[in-house]
Amino acid sequence: NPANPRYINAVEIYVRDLFTRIGNSSALCDVVIYNEPVYNASVHESCNPMWQNFLQNKYKDISAVNTAYGANYGSFEEISMPKEVSGEKIFGDYMQFNDEIMSELHHTVSEYIGKYTKAFRHTKVMQYIRPYVGGERLNKSNNYELWANAFDVNGCDAFSAQAQEEHIPLYAKAAWYDYMR
């Protein structure tokens, strides 16, 4: 669970220990912070209080949630994260919640690394732009727009859009450039 403070603390210790040793090496030119990072908070019951707090901050009042969802919840504590992809409003809120967890993680880890090295920081994300795996976007927390300013450069993994399949439309091939800074 990347939102767990113990996980964040472990990452901070790892980054500090690693980059105090190699951070100023002339051989280090870049740091790939994550390789195809994904997260699905709904598989962690420990995230339910965070989810409920997210909803409370967004809607302020349980009646507003009930109106938005067409539901009849008595309190925010009754609302669990959806387990399946759906077109319902609750799933849109879940996507936003899940995306924010990973975005915060990317920004935090990038900031930690930036304390110890001047190497370029980036992440490898482009796999899930491909149209035929678009469902991955719905439940894997990969909203690149939220992450972009955490890194020195974005994109750069165009294998799937540039050379693999002839049937991939131009917009997917051009998407690679949209994530560059």
Identify the meaning behind each predicted range.
Residues 174-181:
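Short, intrinsically disordered, charge-balanced linker/junction segments flanking boundaries
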Residues 1-173:
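Polysaccharide-binding and catalytic clefts of secreted carbohydrate-active enzymes
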